[in-house]
């Protein structure tokens, strides 16, 4: 990926993260949101309560959505949808602070529920990998949180 594309992606991810942080009610005073490069997670969120790193996964890309609509589709790297999700969840990132996963999508649709259910099943059966929490931030401000063995829809709206 060219450095210009990486910069555009990083700027967009910071914007999404700011919207997410606002939706869950995290104050935006005295915080810093920094983009990071591989092998670190995408975002470093610095706040007085303690720093947290976030890896972001955009669930509206055709690569991610289409296989969820038809579970039999195979990716070019021969990974199924479940394998692709597991690969993301179980990637090892270099970070000395807790890491959360933020799965986000812009538009509400029936596929949103498919994303939630497919990911929830993987997390329930296989765990969260290196992530402390898995957050879902979706169309119309729907926000869900997964932590180890519990799952909750948060009553927040963007």
PLM regions and their residue ranges:
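Metal-dependent nuclease catalytic core centered on acidic motifs
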Residues: 1-38, 57-158
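A short, glycine/Asx- and small/polar-enriched loop/turn
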Residues: 37-39, 47-50
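Conserved catalytic cores of phosphodiester-cleaving nucleases, focusing on short active-site segments
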Residues: 43-45, 52-60
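Short acidic, glycine-rich loop/turn motifs
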Residues: 45-47, 138
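Structural motif
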Residues: 50-52, 100
């Amino acid at each position: 990926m060219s450095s210009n594309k990486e910069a555009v992606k990083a700027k967009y991810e910071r914007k999404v993260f700011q919207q997410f942080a606002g939706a869950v009610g995290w104050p935006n005073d005295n915080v810093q949101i920094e983009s990071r490069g591989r092998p670190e997670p995408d975002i470093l969120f610095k706040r007085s309560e303690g720093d947290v790193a976030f890896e972001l996964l955009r669930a509206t890309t055709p690569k991610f959505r289409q296989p969820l609509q038809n579970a039999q589709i195979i990716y070019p790297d021969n990974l199924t949808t479940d394998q692709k999700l597991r690969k993301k969840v179980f990637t090892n990132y270099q970070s000395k602070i807790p890491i959360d996963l933020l799965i986000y999508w812009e538009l509400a649709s029936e596929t949103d529920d498919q994303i939630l259910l497919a990911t929830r099943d993987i997390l329930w059966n296989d765990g969260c990998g290196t992530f402390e929490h898995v957050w879902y931030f979706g169309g119309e401000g729907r926000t869900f949180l997964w932590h180890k063995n519990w799952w909750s829809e948060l009553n927040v709206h963007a």
